[in-house]
C-alpha cells in the first residue's frame, strides 16, 4: 500500500514539483514548490482527521495535497488536470481503483470554477491549499506588480495565518 511518505520521496513526483517551482519562479508567480506542497499535504491530512475521515482517507488527502500543483511545470492554465494525469501515470498500478480515482479527482478539482465535491477529500484539499497564505510565497520583487496581482497582494500582506476546523459547523 502506497503511503504519503512514499509519494513524498518518489523521484518523479519530487522532480515535477521542483520543475513547477522553477517554472513559477521564472514567471514571478506565487510559490508552488516543495514548501507549499508539504504544507498543503500536512494540512490536508490534519483537516481530514479533524472532520472524521478515516486514517486511509486522511493519507489519500495528504497525497493529493502533496501532488496537487505538480502539473504547473507543463502549463499554469490546466495544471490541475495535468497533475491528476501525472499522478495516475506514476502510481496508477499501485492503488486500488477507487483510491486512485479519489486522489485524481481531488487534484483535478482543486483549481476549477465549477468544483464538484463528490467526496470530502476534494473539499479537504481545497481548504488546505487555499489556507496556505504567507508572504514567503511571493516571488515577485516589484511592488507595483505585487499590488497588481490578487494572489501576491494577499500573500504579501500576510505574515502569519492559521486554520481552525470546527467539526460541529
Question: Where in this protein do the model-derived segments appear?
Answer:
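General secondary-structure edge motif
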Residues: 20, 24-27, 63, 87
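Membrane-interface starts of transmembrane alpha-helices
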Residues: 96-100
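Ubiquitous "structural anchor" signal
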Residues: 73, 79, 91, 137-140
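His-Asp-centered metal-binding catalytic motifs of divalent-metal-dependent phosphohydrolases/nucleases
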Residues: 40, 56-87, 102-112
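Structured all-alpha helical bundle cores of eukaryotic regulatory proteins
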Residues: 82-89, 93, 121
